[in-house]
């Protein structure tokens, strides 16, 4: 099960993002609404909502705001008429970029995303141009205080598909449907991950030099600062010198 995806290195930005948690209130609130609308308010039956609540708590969104967003999603309270949209394009160095958005105005959002991609050295593409390069996976990052054998012992029984050595951390992948059961199994065994999310993981990476890597991170930051953008994914393999 050992491997090396290098997907983890672009996640190293999270330490910087965490300093700006307040900007994620809007994003996690939208995800709570969308998740509740899609699968109802019962977290036992709605894994997406369970993950959304965990993400909301991670950025310290108040409980009353969490409850309010869920009620807006189920229709118990009036709320925005949000639509989920996926935009595809290319970034510096020719890397593939996926932009997940939640919007009440498609025309506004597509224009803004197109503008930001162009401004950041990329370009909007047609639907389907890069999404085939990615698979949706549950992704966990564990410190090396745990051994691969320990992770395998718990993971293999609860849906883990792959365990990879990513230098300072172990990375565990699973199918999206197994994400919450696997997280619960790890936590029950006292194995709390440093990071866990359902993400679009690329099949192959595109290596970038320092200049292109810095341009890409600037582009991703611009996209993530847009209030309609929920998540940004790429298949960039960033140089180690960016994280020294």
Curated annotation (Swiss-Prot):
Domain of life, per lineage: Bacteria
Keyword Transcription among UniProt keywords: yes
InterPro entries found in the cross-reference section: Integrase-like_N (IPR017856), TACO1_YebC-like_2nd/3rd_dom (IPR048300), TACO1_YebC_N (IPR049083), Transcrip_reg_TACO1-like (IPR002876), Transcrip_reg_TACO1-like_dom3 (IPR026564), YebC-like (IPR029072)
UniProt cross-references to SUPFAM superfamilies, sorted A to Z: YebC-like
Annotated keywords: Cytoplasm, DNA-binding, Transcription, Transcription regulation
Signal sequence coordinates: none
Molecular-function annotations in GO: DNA binding
Location in or out of the cell: Cytoplasm
Cellular component GO terms, alphabetical: cytosol
GO BP term, pick one: regulation of DNA-templated transcription
NCBIfam families: PRK00110.1, PRK12378.1, YebC/PmpR family DNA-binding transcriptional regulator
Assigned protein family: Belongs to the TACO1 family.
Name of this protein: Probable transcriptional regulatory protein DMR_30850
Organism per entry: Solidesulfovibrio magneticus (strain ATCC 700980 / DSM 13731 / RS-1)
Upper classification of the organism: Bacteria, Pseudomonadati, Thermodesulfobacteriota, Desulfovibrionia, Desulfovibrionales
């Amino acid at each position: 099960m050992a491997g090396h995806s290098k997907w983890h290195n672009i996640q190293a930005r999270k330490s910087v993002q965490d300093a700006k948690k307040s900007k994620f209130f809007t994003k996690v609130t939208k995800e709570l609404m969308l998740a509740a609308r899609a699968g109802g308010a019962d977290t036992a039956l709605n894994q997406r909502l369970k993950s959304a609540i965990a993400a909301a708590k991670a950025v310290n969104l108040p409980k009353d705001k969490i409850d309010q967003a869920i009620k807006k999603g189920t229709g118990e309270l009036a709320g925005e008429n949000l639509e989920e949209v996926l935009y595809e394009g290319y970034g510096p160095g020719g890397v593939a970029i996926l932009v997940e958005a939640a919007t009440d105005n498609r025309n506004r959002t597509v224009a803004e995303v197109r503008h930001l991609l162009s401004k950041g050295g990329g370009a909007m593409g047609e639907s389907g141009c890069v999404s085939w390069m990615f698979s949706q996976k549950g992704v966990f990052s564990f410190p090396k205080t745990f051994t691969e054998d320990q992770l395998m012992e718990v993971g293999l029984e609860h849906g883990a598909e792959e365990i990879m050595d990513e230098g300072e951390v172990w990375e565990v992948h699973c199918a999206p449907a197994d994400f919450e059961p696997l997280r619960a199994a790890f936590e029950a065994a006292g194995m709390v991950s440093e990071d866990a999310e359902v993400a679009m993981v690329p099949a192959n990476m595109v290596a970038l030099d320092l200049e292109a890597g810095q341009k890409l991170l600037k582009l991703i930051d611009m996209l993530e600062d847009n209030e309609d953008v929920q998540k940004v994914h790429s298949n960039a393999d960033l140089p180690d010198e960016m994280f020294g």
